[in-house]
Amino acid sequence: MRPMTHVPVLYQEALDLLAVRPGGVYVDATLGGAGHARGILERGGRVIGLDQDPEAVARAKGLHLPGLTVVQGNFRHLKRHLAALGVERVDGILADLGVSSFHLDDPSRGFSYQKEGPLDMRMGLEGPTAKEVVNRLPLEALARLLRELGEEPQAYRIARAIVAAREKAPIETTTQLAEIVRKAVGFRRAGHPARKTFQALRIYVNDELNALKEFLEQAAEVLAPGGRLVVIAFHSLEDRVVKRFLRESGLKVLTKKPLVPSEKEAAQNPRARSAKLRAAEKEAP
């Protein structure tokens, strides 16, 4: 496993809103490179770190950080993971919903449309791969997936191009798919033409929106009074789910408008550009 750098997005803002207190128990629900978790530990908190990716779990365990308990699992099963540790209430929960830099930088995981790799896109080890989805899904279902989960205006044209290509030979790699999309839609000013297609497939393969809804409901339940929930979303579908949940959850919303990266952070870390942070607090009954 080669070392890679992980740049936590909205690092200071997330930790400040989490309001870490020494001795408190906090959940980093998307442990990844443990960037945010380290910040919580440095402020005296104890951290339960969840990640469904076995590689991320192995990396985090290898750090041997005092006060960090690493658990492999999906955050949609938050209550189950906490129960297994004998934990009923926590003082704060943080979720960074972005694709980990480790995933994007490792071509073998199949998340990047710029680096050749197998069409996988699974965060964990379960479920269908992106390769299975693009080679098996009927035209109408594929177009709907791209339109609804990728917010892709040319969904039908891309779906048609995918179906035409797979009739000649199976679509095997990330760059193969990216080229099919590029030829179908042509040049775009705003980013790579395959960006929204890859987003849609990743969300579908990992059932991300349903997992997020389940996580948020459980997070509100396990927070102790005064405990805080901090969520960083990276696209409008995620942010919409978080915004709606916070509005309807009964939690006290701490961010009237979402926090976004400064121009300096966005320049230093282009992947942070679309991030939106929302936070809420569980009030005493």
From Swiss-Prot:
Disordered: annotated segments: 259-285
Keywords for this entry? Cytoplasm, Methyltransferase, rRNA processing, S-adenosyl-L-methionine, Transferase
Q: One MF term in GO for this entry?
A: rRNA (cytosine-N4-)-methyltransferase activity
Q: Which reactions are catalysed by this chain?
A: cytidine(1402) in 16S rRNA + S-adenosyl-L-methionine = N(4)-methylcytidine(1402) in 16S rRNA + S-adenosyl-L-homocysteine + H(+)
Residues noted as binding S-adenosyl-L-methionine in the record, renumbered to the chain: 34-36, 51, 75, 96, 103
Q: What subcellular locations does the record give?
A: Cytoplasm
Q: Which PANTHER family match?
A: 12S RRNA N4-METHYLCYTIDINE METHYLTRANSFERASE (PTHR11265:SF0), S-ADENOSYL-METHYLTRANSFERASE MRAW (PTHR11265)
Q: Does the keyword Isomerase apply?
A: no
Please tell me which top-level EC class this enzyme sits in. transferase
| Gene Ontology BP terms | rRNA base methylation
What is the recorded name of this protein? Ribosomal RNA small subunit methyltransferase H
User: What is its biological role?
Assistant: Specifically methylates the N4 position of cytidine in position 1402 (C1402) of 16S rRNA.
Q: What is its EC number?
A: 2.1.1.199
Q: Which GO terms describe its cellular component?
A: cytoplasm
The record's comment on protein family reads:
Belongs to the methyltransferase superfamily. RsmH family.
**InterPro entries per UniProt:** RsmH, SAM-dep_MeTrfase_MraW_recog, SAM-dependent_MTases_sf
